[in-house]
């Protein structure tokens, strides 16, 4: 029995020694031994082979009855505006048949609206050999099945223990390091050590995700005293960005593991955590942000203006609060490659631990980060217009769909004002067309 215990201790020590020597230490120093690159090369070749096998295995492709206009689309929509579509049926006056237009739009929204589908995982064009994404894919060949089984063994018996070890090291180092640094008096030494801890631990955590991050246009990286705004897909967005530079973060208070990390990191760095439902918290956040931006020696602030996680196919409405405090805005676009793993956090379905387990049993996290030129509020431009301009720039750069809807619809009911807006538009159309119809022949309305 003692021999088994000694063997287990020896194996554990050997395992940790290899992890520290080959992964943790190089990550902390910001160097790579080429292990991640070799793994990604093998993974890409395997998925390419699997895609070819799947395409060959489809003997009789099913006829496509409907054109799919966008990702995750299952119905064909007519995007003609209300006024043009109804005017094409008749002119000027109300007709009972107009009801059918609104009924059709209602049925389309029930079957597939453009908002709620952004809160579920993106559908893949080709299967990536993960069980959780094989809804639309079926048995093709024995060879492909064998490769899938080998993949399951590799992911759960080798990658999961390795990633769990790295995550435990990274999170523990983050909590302990920031707690210790937080005891130091405010000053340049504390700020320097805080940046070292955040940067080092973020690099280890990226390795725990088998992360391959491509940073573009580094000359546009956020500067001190500025505000960095980015589209939001997952809590790991912050790790992805901190892997290349440190930020003072602003975000919602969380419980559980996330809460422990938040309470530890705020001791060493001026992060701002708040409760969105508390009005006094929001006023306090605005005040803190103004003070932070006024000091050009402080770290740039990292804000996700959508306020919730979106599935990385679109960018939804930016809250205007981040754009009211002044200062220079540094937009950042983040785009994940779903072929290697789904980075989206469906917080209404999975807690943070379940989400991390799904991430750690995926193949890898691959994403592109684009630093964009700084933007400032134009003269005569209000906060909402400025927010929309920044959102449009991020959507274009990341190849994402731009949606005007509030991400808060993920949990809240649709406001009555949205329904009333459709009624107002229809009423205005009837009044305008009716006025035009009452004009004498040969005249035009203004």
Swiss-Prot record:
Official protein name in the record: Glycerol-3-phosphate acyltransferase 3
Membrane topology term: Multi-pass membrane protein
Similarity comment text for this entry: Belongs to the 1-acyl-sn-glycerol-3-phosphate acyltransferase family.
CDD domains attached to this UniProt entry: LPLAT_LPCAT1-like
Catalytic reactions of this protein: sn-glycerol 3-phosphate + an acyl-CoA = a 1-acyl-sn-glycero-3-phosphate + CoA; a 1-acyl-sn-glycero-3-phosphate + an acyl-CoA = a 1,2-diacyl-sn-glycero-3-phosphate + CoA; dodecanoyl-CoA + sn-glycerol 3-phosphate = 1-dodecanoyl-sn-glycerol 3-phosphate + CoA; sn-glycerol 3-phosphate + hexadecanoyl-CoA = 1-hexadecanoyl-sn-glycero-3-phosphate + CoA
GO molecular function, one term: 1-acylglycerol-3-phosphate O-acyltransferase activity
Described purpose of this protein according to its UniProt entry: Converts glycerol-3-phosphate to 1-acyl-sn-glycerol-3-phosphate (lysophosphatidic acid or LPA) by incorporating an acyl moiety at the sn-1 position of the glycerol backbone. Also converts LPA into 1,2-diacyl-sn-glycerol-3-phosphate (phosphatidic acid or PA) by incorporating an acyl moiety at the sn-2 position of the glycerol backbone. Protects cells against lipotoxicity.
